[in-house]
């Protein structure tokens, strides 16, 4: 069953490894604690995997700091991506893929090529939010991506500007069984991980 010993051990291991990456991406123990809490809140609100959200934060934090963004900005972008994926109806696998591609784009400082295509295919709502936030037509984004014009300093504020709208849209949607299950898994992983650290 779901609570078999092997599963418990793998959840505890996943919690440890995700949080180790989160610690490395944080500038202090206070920032780590607050980021961990906000990421869990985002995960539970959107029914997305804590591991995926923490990975997006951990992978993009360093590069976003180089552009002068704070941990709070990284958390807002993470929430915009997660919420956009849920509104888009992305599967867990698709969401994981988009999160990986998007964090790679942020690490490089530009969203283009394969990374843009991945977000465009599975994250329709993210792309529409990006277009709205940048004040351009959605159809123009592909050409901008090809020209290397979707730089982090444009993409990040554009997505953050749409967060309120994304939150409202998501709040109006009925909850799915899969997001309920993900919420239980997130909470259980935190509990197992916490018990394991005690």
Regions flagged by a language model, labelled:
Residues 50, 89-96:
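Structural motif
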Residues 162-198:
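Hydrophobic, low-dielectric interface segments
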Residues 69:
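ATP-dependent adenylate-handling ligase core
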Residues 1-46, 55-66, 76-87, 97-146, ...:
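Small-residue helix-packing and pore-constriction motifs in hydrophobic alpha-helices
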